[in-house]
Amino acid sequence: MISRRISEVGERMDNRLSSMRILVVEDSPVVAEVLKEMLLDFGCEVVGPVGNMAVALELAQSERLDAAVIDLNIRGGKVYPVARLLGERGIPFLLASGYADWTMPPEWEGRPRLPKPFTAEALSGALEALLAPPVAS
């Protein structure tokens, strides 16, 4: 049932995300694997997943990325340095967390968030919103 639902969402997102390179920063092996599979089903190319701050910083600096999904807390602390680097490079990112406390620097208060646990539909909706072209006013 779950994999079928992921496939249905993946089919809907396939054209839009098929060439997107998404960095995954997640220190839980189970969550990282599920997230990776969801993104692959959407047609994304997954960079990572990584759960180490130093490696996450290296990939955020050196890889060609279209977006990122980053866990707010990983081994080594809060992911603020990774988020800051992605922001400096103009790479959009989702902050993911299973904690109720979303305390973060003011500059990221309005950032898109992905509460854990999440479904394939929630992830696809968040990515659609994150990667949507700006609406002219």
Name every feature range the model reports, one short phrase each.
Residues 49-67:
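Acidic, metal-coordinating helix/loop segments flanking the phosphotransfer/catalytic sites
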